[in-house]
Amino acid sequence: MSVTAFTNAVLVCPIGGEIRDRTLLVEDGVVTGMGDAPEGATVVDCGGKLLAPGIVDLGVFKVDRAACRAGGIVRIGLMPDQSPVLDDPGVVQRAALIGRPDLWIHPIAAATRSLAGTDLAEMAVCVSAGAKAVGTGRSWIADSGVMHRVLAYAGDLGLTVISHAEDGGLAADAVATEGETASRLGLPSAPAIAEALAIARDLMLAEETGAKLHIRQVTTASGFDLIRAAKRRGVKVTCGITPAHLHLSDIAVTDFRTYARLSPPLRDESDRQAALAAVADGTVDVIGSGHDPHGPESKRLPFVDAEAGMAGAETLLPLALMLVRDERITLPRLFALLASNPARVLGLDTGTLEPGKPADLMLFDADKPWMVSGDALASAGNTPFDGFPVQGRALRLWKAGREIL
């Protein structure tokens, strides 16, 4: 039996909302409790820094071990938009293994074959192969009958359906949010209500079927209002957002900055403020990186031709910590958003420092200043935060008690 004592640590406990100066005890890769280090234990001196659950990044589009390690991410929920699509048990099983030994990968199986939005995928066999949820990928299922069957089938399996919320009839060819910025730049745009229309339909179907629904990114005031109302009615819905939609508005695409071309697109300032309020009041359950790195060949193109997406894994922690420094949320609440809540969406018994949980741990310095540089990121440097001053760095990282950073 191997016992490790993490001493001189400030423990961030998302369950219970506490910060404690205690010693954390780990035995054979599992948290056993808090207390004095037993004789013969391996001692890790944390130097007074913060020790928290490793980040569970829900909604990642590419397995990127170096970027995840640098960002304090121990587990990822891998989106089904892979090549090949995660709609086959063999493909799902291989995807679950490719992060070893440094990263837990939890595949999100495709809800429909080839993510085409027509025929249901073989969800049950994908679950047996390791899928932890099912998803619609980068797009919305337009056929309400298909989405109803997806939710009903997933509900029978106890799975969460992870949905992209943009009405394709309005947003299909859009690259920006309708408004002053898009008009000035002459960009094809869609009204922000495209999100609310998609959310409203999916919420009604989730309520009808009793299934668990996670809207991966909600970015508009009207969308948050719908989520709040549904939660009050008892609908089993959760929602997420990325730091980009919390810290940037559509002004960031001025001068046709393709690194700020995202999906869903950046919104106007009023929607950004609504997003910050939704994080503060508990409407938002998850903050994820939306990690979707692209090389210059995909981004250094005319805005309408550039790929949507950004490299986000390495900057997730410092950008999320800005919410704590701005006193919008507490540090324990932040790690509920980054670890325990996304774990719960995926049906994982992790993301906390409670006894019996896997010792997925991150030691970090919340005050360490650095400058985001696309050229220096571990993954492709397509970040809209290039040149942005931030604070917060992962110092050491453990996966089931084994150090990986």
Could you say what each language-model-derived stretch is?
Residues 9, 24, 29, 48, ...:
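Divalent metal-coordination and catalytic microenvironments
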